[in-house]
A protein has these predicted regions:
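Acidic (Asp/Glu) carboxylate-rich active-site/surface patches
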Residues: 127
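Glycine-enriched, solvent-exposed interface loops adjoining structured elements
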Residues: 1-123, 135, 150-152, 159, ...
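Extended, beta-strand-rich, solvent-exposed assembly scaffolds of outer structural proteins
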Residues: 132-189
Length: 293
């Protein structure tokens, strides 16, 4: 990003708070992935009896895999057999009005989350010093993989330190890797109160409530890039595309500063990088064996 700026702009950039710089880069990386659909992940959801809506991760963009009929699908496993529910509209599910629990779904929809996510409140059970821009949130009383489900990109507040930031990754049931800003230490002490705001915006909505606990729904999806808000964070992207992303971050900064000519030049470089990746994706899709079976 620095290479794309002239000397006065670099000086101005150094007086910009650290989080804002990361936000420019993150926004550019997210836009790149949205345009190219180049990053994928898989999440496994676990059914709960009588439940119909299941939260998707905060980095969910859209579904990824289709069947041979060009229909989006997910994989449902009941412990012995696999089923392949198909994407439909929420309107169709609503009109179908299936209120009785079903053994397995035939259809599902992707919807906006129906209710505001509940806050996760807690107190740390160990200190987490800031190292290379990251700090560990430890809470032995929580279950961040299940009951107190947390995903990367959820927002975290250290009430004691008056700092806030993002969850970068979930290490295990009791540990989160975070990046904090605007506080006194931007780290966690033992016994610090914290609040996590879940950033989940989408849900997978089954055509009927689940009959049984413990079945799994495997959802392949196009995902946002990992949040890079620390010294050694990096995106799961080929390095050849990172220059274009940095140019878009420079565009966002220059646009704010009123340097529209330079901003437009860098935005053009970004769009050229998007076209290049799309061209490479198209060539790969034409290779032998690339068809859908």
């Amino acid at each position: 990003m620095l290479d794309a700026l002239d000397a006065p702009q670099k000086d101005e950039l150094f007086h910009t708070d650290e989080r804002t710089l990361y936000q420019y880069l993150d926004r550019a990386a997210v836009d790149f992935v949205r345009e190219t659909r180049c990053l994928t992940k898989t999440v496994v959801l676990t059914t709960v009896a009588a439940q119909q809506a299941y939260d998707l991760p905060a980095d969910f963009i859209e579904l990824y895999l289709k069947n041979r009929n060009d229909r989006f699908t997910v994989k449902y496993y009941d412990g012995s057999d696999y089923f392949w529910p198909l994407l439909t509209s929420f309107d169709r599910i609503f009109r179908g009005n299936l209120t009785d629990n079903q053994d397995y779904p035939l259809r599902f929809a992707i919807i906006d989350k129906l209710s505001q996510p509940a806050l996760i409140n807690g107190t740390t059970t160990a200190a987490g010093a800031k190292t290379a821009g990251q700090c560990i949130l430890t809470d032995g009383a929580k279950a961040f993989l299940t009951t107190n489900l947390v995903y990367p990109r959820d927002v975290v507040h250290n009430v004691a330190d008056k700092s806030d930031g993002l969850v970068l990754s979930v290490t295990d049931a009791t540990h989160l890797v975070t990046a904090l800003f605007t506080g006194k230490k931007n780290a966690f002490g033992n016994g610090d109160s914290y609040v996590i705001q879940r950033a989940t915006a989408k849900q997978l909505y089954l055509d009927a409530p689940s009959e049984t606990d413990g079945h799994t729904i495997t959802v392949p999806y196009i995902c946002m890039p990992d949040p890079v808000y620390s010294d050694y964070g990096f995106w799961r992207l080929p390095a050849t595309y990172c220059h274009g992303i940095a140019c878009e971050a420079a565009f966002l900064f220059q646009n704010r500063e009123g340097d529209y000519v330079s901003a437009d030049r860098h935005h053009i470089l970004f769009t050229q990088e998007i076209r290049r990746m799309r061209s490479e994706q198209a060539r790969a899709a034409l290779q032998p064996g690339a068809g859908r079976y």
